Amino acid sequence: MVVIEIGEQAHRLRDITSAMSHPRVLWYHLILPTYGFWLPNDPRGSWSTFVGSWELCKFGRATRTSEKRSLAHEAHDRELRLAAKRALKYPPVRFDELQRQAIADGFATAVEEGGYVVHACCVGHDYAHLVVARHERTIERIASHLKSKATMSLTRQQMHPLRDFTTRDGTIPTPWSAGIWSVFIDDRDHLNSAIRYVERHPAKEGLAPQRWTFVSSA
């Protein structure tokens, strides 16, 4: 049988197929890094596609290695890493308090539009954490929707961190990294741990507790 995918039906078919390929996934711990937060060619690494410990997410996305231990604290050429950051086209993005509120406003819009269920959310200096229930859409599409509405909110409120780099045609570079991290959650204990982690995370960033209207209890 040949299936021809057209427009939104194509997205829907791919999303349903993706969900079926991970039948045990009930929730996701989604991490959205900002532009410049981490470089994919960082000389450090770890043992899997996702950083095994959430605490190590702050050290960035890992490159694959055969090591059975974390290499996040391994000695590496710090100057090389900093030079790579300096070579970025735009300055690394860090959100201030007003920008974090604008981002949350955008997230709220996406949650309402998509009918997503979010159990926890932290908007930090250079990334956002969310615990999201499984949905007919893929986590990649949900992430794209969240980032899009957050960016629109920043732009509308004239708080876009890269507005000084607006092009002649009015385009502003995205404040988000192209990639995301998503940790699959398939049991209630893991869910509760993820929620606690995200709820406590603002304090680790030196931020006040965050309470968002689009977050619902699990």
Model-flagged regions — what are they?
Residues 1-218:
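Short catalytic/metal-binding and nucleic-acid-binding patches
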